[in-house]
Amino acid sequence: MREFHYGVHMLAVEVGDITESDAEAIVNAANSSLMGGGGVDGAIHSAAGPELNGELVKIRRERYPNGLPPGEAVITRGYRLKASHIIHTVGPVWMGGRNGEDDVLYRSYRSCLDLAREFGIHDIAFPALSTGAYGFPFDRAERIAIRSVIDFLKDESAGYTVRFVFYTEDQGKRFLFILSDLGLPVNWNRDVQENT
């Protein structure tokens, strides 16, 4: 894990299983149905237990009968996860980059952060939204993720911890390269070695 400061905020780059994160909230790369699926979505549903599905059925029925629109987010309890909450967002499906995908992805990250603030959550873990089955090019997606997160943090005086959790070491290294390439005014705190 690599941690660094951005003003009063902490950003972390982690490699591993987001369902094991001890952040206050983890973000689920959901589909519009909110009923689970493959990848991160399926893993979170499985780890959280069947109670999660019950809460999401209620949210669908009461607030989103046609499904959660891309770029929006909803929050649920974490149930059997270490995280107390799950923030579910629907990222865009990559259609070549000419259908507003960048804006929708930006809004997906921002919607999650806005919900975190609303619920008093100051430690949130994100997967690489839309970069799996939805086909969004990784480097482009992560530049958008960073921009959305930094735009949120620069206006916040309360300290937040934002974690970017990647499935592979290669993704984590690519993300660190993107951070460096963007020339953000961050202060590297440390490399944190995991005890295995």
Curated annotation (Swiss-Prot):
Belongs to the MacroD-type family. Residues 1-183 form the Macro domain. Pfam families: Macro. It comes from the Archaea. PANTHER family: GANGLIOSIDE INDUCED DIFFERENTIATION ASSOCIATED PROTEIN 2-RELATED (PTHR11106), MACRO DOMAIN-CONTAINING PROTEIN (PTHR11106:SF27). InterPro entries: Macro_dom, Macro_dom-like. SUPFAM superfamilies: Macro domain-like (SSF52949). This is Uncharacterized protein Ta1105.
